[in-house]
């Protein structure tokens, strides 16, 4: 179960921030042990006894970020509700999980993304996936969807 994450961390080398969008399933201590940088982790619908927060807001550079697992915003149906919530929070970026399927859109100043899942991918082909976000020298965000 941890093999894919271990591989990704090894390939990535140095990272400044790690974000997990829920369904940690009791692996909080493991993540604390292997992730040495700043981390933001939210509770998913399978994290029954977790004390992790349901959602978080923070800034990455000039971007205000809202993260949530997404099930409270019906992301399995569409992204309309989560977009509405992100806009009400003045977010520039909203990240969610829950569907275990990669998703990316940029519209009217809002980036909406789901990196997919390293452990339980559900998109066609079921390739484990994650996303890398980099901020360039001018402070602009760039995103890369990656597959194992």
Summary of predicted features, one role per range:
Residues 36-38, 110:
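A short helix->loop->beta-strand "cap" motif at the edges of active sites that frequently abuts
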Residues 57-66, 106-112, 133-143:
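Beta-strand-turn-beta hairpins that frame and shape the catalytic cleft
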Residues 17-23, 40-45, 66-69, 93-98, ...:
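Active-site neighborhood of phospho(di)ester-bond hydrolases with catalytic His/Asp-centered motifs
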Residues 1-5, 25-29, 46-51, 73-77, ...:
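Active-site environment of divalent metal-dependent phosphoester hydrolases
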Residues 1-36, 47-48, 53-54, 126-129, ...:
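N-terminal active-site segment of His-dependent metallophosphoesterases
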Residues 3-6, 84-90, 113-148:
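Binuclear metal-dependent phosphoesterase catalytic core
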Residues 38-85, 89:
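Helix-adjacent hinge/juxtasegments
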């Amino acid at each position: 179960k941890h093999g894919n994450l271990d591989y990704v961390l090894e390939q990535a080398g140095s990272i400044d921030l790690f974000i997990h969008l829920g369904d940690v399933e009791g692996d909080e201590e493991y993540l604390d042990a292997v992730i040495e940088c700043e981390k933001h982790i939210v509770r998913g619908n399978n994290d029954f006894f977790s004390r992790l927060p349901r959602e978080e807001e923070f800034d990455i550079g000039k971007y205000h970020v809202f993260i949530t697992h997404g099930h409270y915003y019906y992301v399995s149906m569409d992204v309309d509700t989560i977009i509405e919530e992100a806009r009400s929070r003045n977010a520039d970026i909203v990240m969610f999980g829950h569907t275990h399927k990669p998703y990316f859109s940029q519209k009217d100043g809002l980036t909406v993304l789901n990196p997919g899942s390293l452990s339980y991918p559900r998109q066609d082909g079921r390739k484990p996936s994650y996303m890398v976000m980099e901020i360039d020298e001018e402070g602009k965000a760039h995103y890369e969807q990656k597959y194992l």
